[in-house]
Amino acid sequence: MIQNIVIIGTQWGDEGKGKIIDFLTPQVQYVVRYQGGHNAGHTIVVNHKKVTLHLIPSGILHDNIINIIAGGVVLSPVILVKEIQKLKKINVLVDDRIFISESCSLILPYHIAIDLAREKISTTVITNNNVIIGTTGCGIGPAYEDKVARRALRVYDLYNLKNFENKLKNIADFYNFQLVQYYHAEPIDYHVVMDEIITVSDILIKKVIDVPELLLNARKRGDKIIFEGAQGSLLDIDHGTYPYVTSSHTTSGGAIVGIGVGPKYIDYVLGIMKAYSTRVGNGPFPTELSGDIAEWLCTRGQEFGSTTGRRRRTGWFDAVSVRHAIKISSINSACLTKIDILDGLKYVKICVAYQSFNGEIIYNFPYSLENLKNITPVYEVLPGWSGRTTGIKKFNQLPLEAKQYIKRIEEVIGIPIDIISTGPDRLMNIIVRNPLNF
């Protein structure tokens, strides 16, 4: 029986994970975020109303589901409290349904300030390649830097606010020197930061729980758990398009580390992928489009970041990069989203391989940035469809060409597609196989 399922993105994020998690949540008892921070926006449509969350797990919109923010997440205290307040205003039950790990590292204003300062200058200290990453400006990277450098403030530091203030002052001095001397930016007043912390600290402390112990006991009881990934596999710090990546592990392995459970407690991995490709920010994008079709995908797909509002770059479905995501996360099956956005196109393309500058055909995703810059997609062209897929709930009701497109994607990525999303609403899905019913 499947008890624990990891749900991750197979592209560069924005694949529609939130909607699918929201759809599957009624079948589980827990939803757990394990990496990233509030740079991960997930938008869910319920009864034609959009709800956008950045930090709180998607399961919060269902009564009786316990939502956990595990230790691998970098947590903004202010953002968490704001999201809790926003949910309460729309009558979502929050109390006793959101818990956090005391080992979460905190995102504080100096992380955001240094993040924005780095992005403003023409070159960045994040890499040695004289490039701008195109971050969300949420302070995620600097917060993870503090974590690795062993100077981060964590949730458990809130237990003693006097000690917290002393540590805060030292770290603020560290960052203010950089902000003023190197980036010529305004310093952060640690007194203001401390005032914010005093305001929210009690709320956070009351939500602390021993996450590994809680989930171990849940498994013993036979409860089902969704481990909710943020961003996408191609943004993984080790296996993504480095240096144009996020600062955490976005693969299924990140769940093990970020939560504090062993590999044997991962029963299934579901990969979410769009029927086309998108990317926000800078970095390699082999199948990127320009012109009318790019505009079509962006406009019809509403491809604007839920965190930054930035326009997403769009391109054809890239089977090479998705196969890479499947390989590095041991993905069992896939969910294909936004098939409805392709309705009306005369043709659709699938990138099945790359061709190098010297004519070599490449079937595996390169790690080297230089190799990625010098490849050309090898496409298969399939007929488009004029019929509508929006809202269809049975596979055999899809237009013939849409079915052919989906089947061909299954063939070239090498795993089955269990779920097909046919629209933004949580119930607009074709369920070929329910991964939680195995």
UniProtKB/Swiss-Prot annotation:
| Pathway assigned to this chain's UniProt record | Purine metabolism; AMP biosynthesis via de novo pathway; AMP from IMP: step 1/2
Q: Does the keyword Zinc apply?
A: no
Question: What GO terms describe the biological role, i.e. biological process, of this protein?
Answer: 'de novo' AMP biosynthetic process; IMP metabolic process
Summarize where substrate binds, as residue positions: S306, T307, T308, G309, R310, R311, R312
Q: How is the cofactor bound?
A: Binds 1 Mg(2+) ion per subunit.
How it assembles, according to the record, is: Homodimer.
**What's the stated role of this polypeptide?**
Plays an important role in the de novo pathway of purine nucleotide biosynthesis. Catalyzes the first committed step in the biosynthesis of AMP from IMP.
The record's comment on protein family reads: Belongs to the adenylosuccinate synthetase family.
Protein name in UniProt: Adenylosuccinate synthetase
Q: Which organism is the protein's source?
A: Blochmanniella floridana
